[in-house]
Amino acid sequence: MSFRKEDGVSSLCQKALHIITELCFAGQVEWDKCSGIFPADRSGQGGGGTDISVSLLAVVVSFCGLALLVVSLFVFWKLCWPCWKSKLVAPNVSTLPQSISSAPTEVFETEEKKEVEENEKPAPKAIEPAIKISHTSPDIPAEVQTALKEHLIKHARVQRQTTDPTSSSRHNSFRRHLPRQMNVSSVDFSMGTEPVLQRGETRTSIGRIKPELYKQKSVDSEGNRKDDVKTCGKLNFALQYDYENELLVVKIIKALDLPAKDFTGTSDPYVKIYLLPDRKKKFQTRVHRKTLNPLFDELFQFPVVYDQLSNRKLHFSIYDFDRFSRHDMIGEVILDNLFEVSDLSREATVWKDIHCATTESIDLGEIMFSLCYLPTAGRMTLTVIKCRNLKAMDITGSSDPYVKVSLMCEGRRLKKRKTTTKKNTLNPVYNEAIIFDIPPENVDQVSLCIAVMDYDRVGHNEVIGVCRTGLDAEGLGRDHWNEMLAYHRKPITHWHPLLELPGRATSFDSQGSCSSPRPPSTP
């Protein structure tokens, strides 16, 4: 029984000792209280094992960190060294000897200073064969020295940055339609060594319009027109106004040098006369047989108010009478200004060339408009003022006219504008402005086509007459354009006669150079 009690007590002691050990090592009991229970050698063994494990862990961590640092440095050197090497080595240094590349940069600076001093001083008589860099460095040959100087001068220059001028984006929509455009990159913008005065004169002359050049062109154009028009004799007539009876008295005197229309070498001429724009009332002379120089001496009277004479024209048509066929037209004479010779208070005799024609020219009326161009803004203003004596297009003897203006470039219509429609009138008044944006460098490439249209509610609108203005126009159209360019910023107003469009149809949109443009071809 005693042995069993001892075994139970010992087991209880072991369990208590085990619990105390767990509490001590778990940190729930202070170590000083536990140190008296355990032997000293055992506690020392536990502390030494802990110190060894901590030191071993520190060694492992240090070694891993050092290895990671070495690996990162190696990778960084492999990646960045080629870039640094390419930057450090100049592209032209390889052509120089190896001895120059090993020289210090301070020598380069001293050589540059010496070169500046030598340029300021007179040139020496002889070139030194070599220059000592230091007491320990070898001699540099003279050829290497000159190459070094050239290299330094080349890299010491400050390169100037140049930019090409860019055009304004305002007229991009206009330039897309133009077949010809100025290549800005081909213009030479280099700085020359010209004198300042001469360069200033060149700048001021660019873009300036010289009126005398345009005047010379207009004079030449008038001479060319006279040469182009074929004449077929002369017509002599006299004009006088009867103030009491309000009559215009026209006396057809004679004609000279008419062409032969018959097989016999003669003609049977007679003359028709109109006071335009009224074609309902006409007069005709007697027929003179077999003569090329007929003598008429016949008087005709047109009832007209004196104040209306400035808006009237005399139209003479000379015909060759043929009994069995259609009468052949010899030519015509149109007197636009009845006051060309005098005020008609007394009889005034007039000689006019007979212009060859095969058909009678129909008077379609006139249009008055003004042109004004602002070169700085690149803006052209066409003001349609009014029309007069338009041709009647309706059965009622009237028309419903409106004006259609097209901006043309080499037969293609770039833009179009139109005025309001005036109802039942042959003398409409508009006073409407039409604006086009045209860059100054493209003014000589464009023209304006002005068409007077008759509005028709049913069917197509009909063309009454057209006129053109521009550098490629003829007669008054070109003169009006040149006058606008010579006196820019000032409205220039003129009357223009309306002409029949050759081969016209009932619709203006399908005619000639005023047709709708084709879309530009894509590259």
From Swiss-Prot:
Cofactor binding, per record: Binds 3 Ca(2+) ions per subunit. The ions are bound to the C2 domains.
Cytoplasmic-side positions: 77-523
GO cellular component terms, semicolon-separated: exocytic vesicle; glutamatergic synapse; plasma membrane; presynapse; synaptic vesicle membrane
Amino acids binding Ca(2+) 2: D262, D320, D322, D328
Keywords: Calcium, Cytoplasmic vesicle, Disulfide bond, Exocytosis, Membrane, Metal-binding, Phosphoprotein, Repeat, Transmembrane, Transmembrane helix
Sequence positions that bind Ca(2+) 4: D394, D400, D454, D456
Vesicular topological domain residue ranges: 1-55
Region Cysteine motif, residue ranges: 13-35
Residues that bind Ca(2+) 3: D322, S325, D328
Matching InterPro entries: C2_dom, C2_domain_sf, Synaptotagmin
Residues modified to Phosphothreonine: T136
Cofactor(s), names only, from the UniProt record: Ca(2+)
Similarity-based family: Belongs to the synaptotagmin family.
Complex formation: Homodimer; disulfide-linked via the cysteine motif. Can also form heterodimers with SYT3, SYT6, SYT7 and SYT9.
Functional note: Ca(2+) sensor specifically required for the Ca(2+)-dependent exocytosis of secretory vesicles containing IGF1 in neurons of the olfactory bulb. Exocytosis of IGF1 is required for sensory perception of smell. Not involved in Ca(2+)-dependent synaptic vesicle exocytosis. Acts through Ca(2+) and phospholipid binding to the C2 domain: Ca(2+) induces binding of the C2-domains to phospholipid membranes and to assembled SNARE-complexes; both actions contribute to triggering exocytosis.
Protein name: Synaptotagmin-10
